[in-house]
Amino acid sequence: EHPYLLTYTSGTTGRPKGVLHVQGGFLVSITREVAYQADAHPEDVIHFATDMGWIMGPWMVVGGGALGCTLVFAEGAPDRPADRLWRLVEAERVSVLGLSPTLVRALLPNGDPEADLSSLRTLVTTGEPWNPDPYRWLFEQVGGGRCPIINCSGGTEVGACFLSPTPAIPIKACSLGGPALGMAMDVVDPAGNSLVGTGEVGELVCRKPFPGMTRGFWRDPERYLDAYWRRLPGVWVHGDWASADQDGYWFLHGRSDDTLNIAGKRIGPAELESAAVAHPAVAEAAAVGVPHEVKGEVAWIFCVPLPGHEPTDELADEVAARAAAELGKAFRPDRVVFVPALPKTRSAKIVRRAVRAKALGKDPGDLSSVENPEALEDIARAL
């Protein structure tokens, strides 16, 4: 129980939280995950495209180090030049590669990798929900159609993953498999009733303790209790929308505090963003809810266009029409705004709360975790 690691959350929902982990629990949880979910062995070479400020940095160091793997570090941005990551894999013969969906979406417009990626055996992804096209590209063009995508999700405060597939079982595209080893996970409605197996979207919760869980927030115990323990008695409420289908596969649908409520119909930003990114001219998207006198709330989608595509009213209409076709007319975005970039944390997560604040002309609050705050000024100018 001796303190081991003080690390900070991404800050996507507010001021970053200082998370305290201890020696035994963190080591056990991370090593178990790298060994049995990423299927790493002593002879493997691991590289996770991250900096040490994201929990996936310690994930690689602690788990990979405990297993005796070779660890590859790289300074600077993984996409400058555009093929840098693929050349690194080729040069170091990386076999376990970790990266975020956001990074994959940024790399995809540069074309298929030309480097020799035959050393790859496992792909590990985390950070945000997937869109089908980038997921398929990663599997087919990076992994050669042979490397499993271990799409996992947990959090800085979890000290491991709540949900994760393993290479030993079939994987459904964009899913997270199911509960990670030792995790008593559930999806519940507002009353706490289980929705697992129904495919309905509910809150992701954990019903039993686990070794890697944080011992609390640094000098802020009340915030820790408010964040996870005071919404449903006796369970950890993680703040993610999730579903588990009849085949036993689990999916995430974005943060529950990012949910839009359009004319009484709830939808997560991930669904709207996925529909927007499916347009061949859109690289990235962030969907936020904006107050509306009649509907209560409408969706605005902020899109980053792919190189070679000029933002026009016609293109905005096309993106909105695609969203309506995929999700229903009720969810057609009220506005599509093109911007050069979206504000992101150092772990490549889009800071939707800041996007929404700018859309409403409000103070975006704590931006200490935002790597490119200038993107918010671009948003303000675009409006």
Locations of regions flagged by a protein language model:
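Conserved pre-ATP/AMP-binding loop-to-beta segment of ANL
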Residues: E1-Y8, R15, Q23-G25, D39-V45
